[in-house]
């Protein structure tokens, strides 16, 4: 299993830059558009839950659940970028993830941040 299955992030040539910082070195914020978010809820897969339960008894990484969470975060990020792009932003500053259990049936992942327009200094 490669890094692409267990990692995430943004493509190098993305038209909407997403950062976890307040600013981007070499750029200035010319317009703050406001909060944007991308949200997804994934249901639990019974097979993964049984496997995770057994694995947790003997220890080790729960690779099936890890892969699902990575996919879920990546989908939330894609939706965040779509929202920012639709509002005319070319950057999302101060991006964060929030992960919550959703009524014992799944996991809610929200990627959120501040949509902005930035330009080179």
From Swiss-Prot:
Signal peptide: none annotated. SUPFAM superfamilies: YbjQ-like (SSF117782). InterPro entries: UPF0145_dom_sf (IPR035439), UPF0145_YbjQ-like (IPR002765). Pfam families: YbjQ_1. Transmembrane segments: none annotated. PANTHER family: UPF0145 PROTEIN SCO3412, UPF0145 PROTEIN YBJQ. Belongs to the UPF0145 family. This is UPF0145 protein SGR_4080.
């Amino acid at each position: 299993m490669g890094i692409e299955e267990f990692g995430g992030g943004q493509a190098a040539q993305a038209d909407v830059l997403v950062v976890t910082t307040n600013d981007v070195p070499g750029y200035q914020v010319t317009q703050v558009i406001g909060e944007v978010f991308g949200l997804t809820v994934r249901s639990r897969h019974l097979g993964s839950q049984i496997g995770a339960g057994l694995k947790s008894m003997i220890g080790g990484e729960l690779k099936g659940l890890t892969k699902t969470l990575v996919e879920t975060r990546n989908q939330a990020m894609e939706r965040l970028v779509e929202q920012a792009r639709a509002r005319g932003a070319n950057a999302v500053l101060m991006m964060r993830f929030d992960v919550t259990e959703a009524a014992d049936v799944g996991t809610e992942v929200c990627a959120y941040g501040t949509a902005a327009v930035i330009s080179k200094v």
